Amino acid sequence: MTIAQEPTALNFECETGNYHTFCPISCVAWLYQKIEDSFFLVIGTKTCGYFLQNAMGVMIFAEPRYAMAELEEGDISAQLNDYAELKRLCEQIKRDRNPSVIVWIGTCTTEIIKMDLEGLAPKLEGELGIPIVVARANGLDYAFTQGEDTVLAAMAHRCPDKAPVAEAEKNERNAVQKLLNFGKKKELVAQEESEYVDHPPLVLFGSLPDPVVTQLTLELKKQGIKVSGWLPAKRFTELPVLEEGYYVAGVNPFLSRTATTLMRRRKCKLIGAPFPIGPDGTRAWIEKICSVFGITPQGLDEREAQIWAGLEDYVKLIRGKSVFFMGDNLLEVSLARFLVRCGMTVQEVGIPYMDKRYQAAELAMLEKACQEMGVPSPKMVEKPDNYNQVQRIYDLKPDLVITGMAHANPLEARGINTKWSVEFTFAQIHGFTNARDILELVTRPLRRNNNLKDLGWDKLVREEAKI
């Protein structure tokens, strides 16, 4: 490998660009599927409704567990009673769907007209008998992924502070099952418990698909670490217990608000680890959790080497190439670190917002990766100005630009390879085994262009019309 220049420390800059991202109410798209007994009510205008329909499809026949409470002129001019209107809607939701929790998603409009959702919710909750969680996931945020951050921070307040005393009732219901498993169950339970090391309770936070949750839980189980719970859980009624002194660790880089809430409000201890994205990140995440609990990690070297060996067919396509992040979903630093490990040069990491405390371990790992791979450190640009970025793209001529959807087609028309950053949000990218999916996404535009070149379709030719 030829070293372009001496690796340098990360250089941080802040521009004054506009935020080019989806609205954070899009978090409903994955959270309503994750929390199976929930109902999401977005309180906003027609614009919010159009956005939700476009982002998630109309889904008329699927009977989705989300709805739009559309504000009308009477709401905005204070002619209608907010409480009465919301009560009518929530009673209908309870009658039709009977969820375990209703999540009110505030929007820009509810902020502007100063709608007191937090004041209305407790009173209505008492009347309905269903928990109502209020999350202000409005478009005033930096990135659309922060919608999830807002919802999880609100849900952290609802986590029980001690284990529920419902075991006796459960035992009575399972009496027959107990009889069938007599002489066997206790041994199995004891054997399973003996696989774990004695350590303080650990709760992981971040919404991931169920297969990925299982993978990460099993990876920690191999090290003798028991995961006490996940926030969010599959069901609202199964939210993890959070007592003072519990340890928490995040799986996504955009959850700084949730981390702050868990530390300040619930008095939990945050494990400041890199995020489990890519084999290197997953290994560092597990190692950090192990080090906090005083456990020596076992077999991680072999596990990581095995994964890298399996990725070689993709890595050879991007080794030595350059990538430019325009900034969209706050996953940029983690993806940049992984791509540096794959042999790419990251020219710039644009990011809408950077919480340097929450991402400290990830930033340190990115800097270390650049030094070890012998590539220059990227320029870190917070709140980038897109006009300036486009000029820098013309100057640097990267092999790939990872960008929001708004800029993808204009850049492609100018002969620049692009990849939609939103795809990384919805793909399964966490853990050892899903690293292949990241590279599948990254290499797709490069492979497509190679195929077009093989066919001789790499040039646009304008011909005069023949009459």
Curated annotation (Swiss-Prot):
Cofactor dependence: [4Fe-4S] cluster
Lineage, highest ranks first: Bacteria, Bacillati, Cyanobacteriota, Cyanophyceae, Nostocales
Biological or metabolic pathway of the protein: Porphyrin-containing compound metabolism; chlorophyll biosynthesis (light-independent)
Assembly with partners or alone: Protochlorophyllide reductase is composed of three subunits; ChlL, ChlN and ChlB. Forms a heterotetramer of two ChlB and two ChlN subunits.
Sites where the protein binds [4Fe-4S] cluster: 23, 48, 108
Gene3D superfamilies xrefs: Nitrogenase molybdenum iron protein domain
Gene: chlN
Record note on cofactor: Binds 1 [4Fe-4S] cluster per heterodimer. The cluster is bound at the heterodimer interface by residues from both subunits.
UniProt cross-references to InterPro entries, sorted A to Z: LIPOR_BchN/ChlN, Nase/OxRdtase_comp1, Protochl_reductN
CDD domains for the chain: Pchlide_reductase_N
E.C. code: 1.3.7.7
Name of the featured protein: Light-independent protochlorophyllide reductase subunit N
Species in which this protein is naturally found: Trichormus variabilis (strain ATCC 29413 / PCC 7937)
Family, similarity comment: Belongs to the BchN/ChlN family.
A GO MF term: ATP binding
